[in-house]
Amino acid sequence: MLSIAFYNIFYHLGKFPIYSWDEARHGVNAYEMLRQGNFIVNTYRYKADYWNLKPPLSYWAIMAGYKLVGFNALGLRLISGICAMLTIIIVAIFVKKNFGNLASLLSMLTLSTSTQFLINHSARTGDADSLFVFLFTAAILSLLLSVKNDKWLYVSGFAFSLAFLTKSWHAGNIAVIMGLYLLFTGRKLSYKKWISLCLCMMAPILIWAVIRYQYDGFAFFKNMFEYDLLHRSTVPIEGHVGDESYYGIVLCRFYFLWLAILLGMILVYNFQNNVLFDKSNSENQSYIIGLCLWVIVPFILYTFAKTKIIWYILPIYPPLSIIIGILASKILMKERFLIRTVLLASILFAAHYYEGEIQTYVNNPIPNDQLSLIEKTKALDGVRGYSLYKYHPTRHKAVWAQSAVLTAELVNDLKVKSGDFHAFLKNDRALLLVKKRFFTKRLVTSNLLNIVTSNRWGYILSKEKIRIKH
């Protein structure tokens, strides 16, 4: 099962072009932080970035990927893929130790074929979400294990702090789940344990905040609170609108067959007058409370937030997979032959269907011709660190896609510029990106320019002759 997950996550991982939202932004932040040797302040085009208002842990993860496999799309996404694998592994281990091998296998199968978890802004992209989902999962599984040993509660608190340092206020879901879990399970902690838990949750965040404050005071925190929390929660920003049915529709779009199987299993249990857990076992009762909260809390909080984005509910896929695995294993081991046969056929059909979707996706990367043209500068001699301008006949300032900014930086440390054609002519260390519909021979001859390279998207021009590397 792990081999299926590994294939789904890593096959052709570096062959897909970089996406502008949001992996390119994170990739630029990480690249520039690494180049400048500043691991605290994220920048975009070498200016402090007050649009991407996240603490630095996800940038550090991308930096690690760059260091391990190079400045390329694979380096951008490597740690996301590893975190997705780790999420599947810790889910499998938790379920195996508490519910048996079959439940573990089925949970792995479900999560390994969850299309949104794999291909939408998570496992196969350089976004912060895969790391966040891993830390979210680690936090809640540790919370569930704390019924056996209080030390796991502190692990949960520490995982929360790392989740906050990855995706900021999104980690609030973990804190809400922790609070409700302790309330509903009747857990009572001593003052000493409360203090220890709070230290585990807050100390890493406070250390980062103090260090960040040294650079720009409260400027980052003000934007982080006002825009990334209050504004995002109360107003649909950047066109991300939706009503109360939004995330239900998202789940049906990406997870319909697994949801149908889950609903069918719940109905079977109701008709058979069975229970999912032994009510006499308080440990099992704690597990079902935690798993239900893990699904319900993020779903409700994101439903009531005004800004709706489909990948916000990624953290609920691990608990859904766990619940499906546990229920399915109980039915397959205890129910009548007909019910077991129907369930097994349904599981195999769903897994086969979603695996087919994943196979289609990973085997058909959609090329981006503009990025491919920029990548061709890798073969040019002596242009590393050049400025890159974009030509427009009406002298408008260039608008750069974030994916183009990152590709330029990764390929040749090119610095994209917003200046017009005349700014390019004044710069001795510069290249000009020209879209094919704007290109004319007169543009080249009248300005004594050279065609450096080209493809079906357009041309790259220079004022000097540039050799191809041998």
Q: Where are these predicted regions, by residue range?
A:
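Short periplasmic/luminal acceptor-recognition loop of GT-C membrane glycosyltransferases, typified by
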Residues: 352-469
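Transmembrane-helix signature of polytopic, membrane-embedded enzymes
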Residues: 91-114
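Hydrophobic/aromatic-rich transmembrane helices and adjacent perimembrane loops
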Residues: 306-332
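Membrane-interface transmembrane helices that cradle and orient dolichyl/undecaprenyl
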Residues: 97-99, 137-153, 328
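Transmembrane-lumen/periplasm boundary regions of multi-pass, lipid-linked membrane glycan transferases
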Residues: 26-32, 158, 162, 166, ...
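Extracytosolic helix-loop segments that constitute the early lumenal/periplasmic catalytic or substrate-binding loops
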Residues: 6-12, 26-50, 57, 64
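Specific aromatic-rich, kink-prone transmembrane helix
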Residues: 90, 131-148, 320-323
